[in-house]
Amino acid sequence: MRVWPAFLSLSCVLVSLFAFSQGSPSSAVAPGSASASGEAATQKTEALPSRSLADVMDRVIEREHLFLAQMRHMHPMVETYIQDLKTDRAGDTRPAKDQYFLGRLDMSDGAEDQSFIGEPGFGQRMVTHLTGVFSMRFLPLGFAQMVVLDSDFQKQYYNFTYVRREFLGDVRCLVIDVQPKEDAPPGRFMGRMWVEDQDYNIVRFNGTYYPHPKTSYYLHFDSWRLNLRSGAWLPAYIYSEESDMKTALGKALHFRAQTRLWGYDLKGLGKNTEFTQILVDSPQSVKDQSDAAADASPVLAQRMWERQAEDNAIDRLQKIGLMAPPGDVDKVLFTVANNILLTNNLDLGSDLRCRVLLTSPLESFTIGHTIVISRGLLDVLPDEASLAMVVAHELGHIALGDTVDTKLAFSDCMFFPDQDSFQRLDFKRSPSNEEAADAKGLELLKNSPYKDKLASAGLFLKALQQSAPELPNLIRPHLGNGFASSKNVRMSTLLASAPQLEPGRTDQLAALPLGGRIKLDPSTDQVELAKAQTIALTSTREKMPFEIAPFFPHLSRLPNSGSEK
């Protein structure tokens, strides 16, 4: 089955043809009017060394067909976050509303998805009318389809122009412009692709699809692949943006979107390897005569039962691909938690853990004695004091004795489809529990090493409170309690001690953009702190609190992965 590229349509749509009420820019460029070949004509092209372009394209197309065959057997998680944009009176662009999707990609019979988030019926998705304002309604599958340059990639459909060699990170690439022939079937890719020069895999492609049907519109996108297996480059990031595309109603489509894919090796994240390990016990270790060999006391048994429920939930979230395996980021979070505990002379036992939820919405919660913080929240926190504020609130829950629902200790409670995870796993607390955790968290912070640095935490809360009405999906939790709502924020007492928000100052960073702090390995689901470059901001436009930015990953090959012939 052909995987049709992403587009806007009244029958098979990516975006419903309804524009929200903000005025369109004074001038508009027809989508797809700037062809890739036109850009190439303004550049000095280089001669393609050694191989002819025809030979190279034969190999590229062969590798792309192999890529499609591989993707039919993979079911990665796919997350799309979209921010509709508007221009204020000062001429600055900022989010007006947002949309979010999380699911699992299935290309075994064309591009399909298994949604983790309940979607309204097809009719509702097509036309959404909100308080008299027309809104853009995105269907997420189209963004996931941008992992494929062309599901029927053939030389007969395209004209190829070699441009130059170029490094993307550590990987030397051939840069090739791609333009569909006049007699090619509709919906063909038009733009530029980067091909690594060892095995001739496509590692990046940037452009749109062409020609544009009368009742639909193709979006522009920039799709990146990473070397996740020997000889295999798999989709990891897709960035899409439109600033002046005209819809059928004459409004301008203005948005930015990020799509991330991960969870390519979920089977490897399980414990199947332990089953095949040969373990030999020494005779001395077979029988334990120590006190530890005694039956658990009632109190210890209750703790062990709660721990079993906690472990079951964490293992299930990790197996699904929603939680990262234990790693170095957990150690950073634990260090912050330990700093707070030590200065408060608070002993929560040796079983305190910290883990990272792999999704973008801003949320944190506890599963028993495990503190869970989302990747998106870690991304936007500006400093360690702000992180301490988040951790202190969750420590408040643990110190007050808020436990996990022990029904999860029964293993059959973990038998449910992955897409039902948000309905079957619920770690929300009551409003009274949240208020008590706020109070306890503030008490812990006042006796912590962060007590004199909480102004930045309060400033973060002010920025979040200001942005919350436009970003309801970014602040909407899926497993725990919300960090903020359109009216309230967590730990709101800190607002009083925070300085005023000054958007005109480049040295005041109340919150960071999404994606700048945490790096996710799409193959192993491991997370690490990104090695961010220190860059001085040249304008307030570059502050981008809670906003989306393009992807530019540093590409590299797997160690010791030779050329696959």
Q: Model segments located where?
A:
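Bacterial N-terminal signal peptides
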Residues: 8-19
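Structured extracytoplasmic
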Residues: 23-190, 198-201, 211-219, 227-232, ...
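Substrate-binding clefts and substrate-entry loops adjacent to catalytic sites
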Residues: 374, 401, 405-432
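Catalytic Zn2+-binding segment of zinc metalloproteases
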Residues: 377, 385-386, 394-411, 449
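Beta-strand-dense domains in secreted/periplasmic systems and polymorphic toxin scaffolds
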Residues: 205, 236-238
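Soluble periplasmic/extracytoplasmic beta-strand elements of cell-envelope proteins
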Residues: 75-79, 175-179, 192-194, 352-357, ...
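Positively charged n-region of N-terminal signal peptides that target proteins for export
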Residues: 1-5
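C-terminal capping/extension segments of zinc metalloprotease domains
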Residues: 270-335, 342-363, 378-380, 384, ...
